[in-house]
């Protein structure tokens, strides 16, 4: 008699889609969830309408997993899809490392995620020393922590740098409150 096949352990992941529901790229949360279910992932949940997907998988090759998801997004939604893929546990560690005030009535707390560490290094280098009266930027493990004045998140020097085409395929930014919502599941 054959022994029963041992089920592999699944890991909770977070896919952060770059540029969704801005710049004319509109994807409904229900459609996004359906795609991830069709890809065979478990416990799929979308968070907010800004391209955040939580899912379980037993796939361990992060690069292959990221490529598979990006290709499926491109095919289904007909746009140049890029994601940052993280284990939820890793995201929790990144959020815990946020070095600035988490609640500040005058500033937004952001985390810049990257799929290519060299690009994050380059952003830090090109940003140079930022004016702390305007914004704050600090490198963390696999992320950049950024804080900028409310109402100016597209106008500061760091914001303009992050908006450059060069970084679109490898970085995406989330408000710290959004990151914390992604950790509650």
Regions found by a protein language model. Give the residues of each.
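Surface-exposed, charge/polar-rich loops and edge strands
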Residues: 2-50, 54-185
């Amino acid at each position: 008699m054959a022994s029963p096949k041992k089920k592999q352990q699944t890991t909770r992941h977070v896919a952060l889609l770059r540029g969704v529901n801005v710049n004319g790229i509109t994807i409904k949360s229900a459609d996004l969830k359906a795609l991830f279910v069709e890809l065979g992932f478990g416990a799929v949940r979308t968070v907010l309408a800004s391209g955040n997907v939580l899912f379980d998988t037993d796939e361990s090759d992060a690069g292959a997993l990221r490529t598979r998801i990006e290709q499926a997004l491109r095919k289904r939604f007909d746009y140049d899809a890029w994601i940052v893929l993280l284990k939820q546990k890793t995201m929790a560690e990144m959020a815990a490392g946020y070095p600035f005030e988490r609640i500040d009535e005058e500033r937004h707390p952001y985390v810049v995620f990257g799929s290519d560490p060299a690009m994050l290094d380059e952003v830090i280098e090109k940003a140079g020393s930022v004016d702390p009266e305007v914004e704050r930027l600090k490198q963390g493990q696999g992320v950049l922590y950024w804080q900028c004045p409310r109402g100016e998140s597209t106008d500061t020097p760091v914001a303009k740098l992050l908006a450059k085409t060069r970084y679109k395929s490898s970085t995406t930014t989330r408000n710290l409150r959004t990151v914390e919502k992604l950790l509650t599941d």
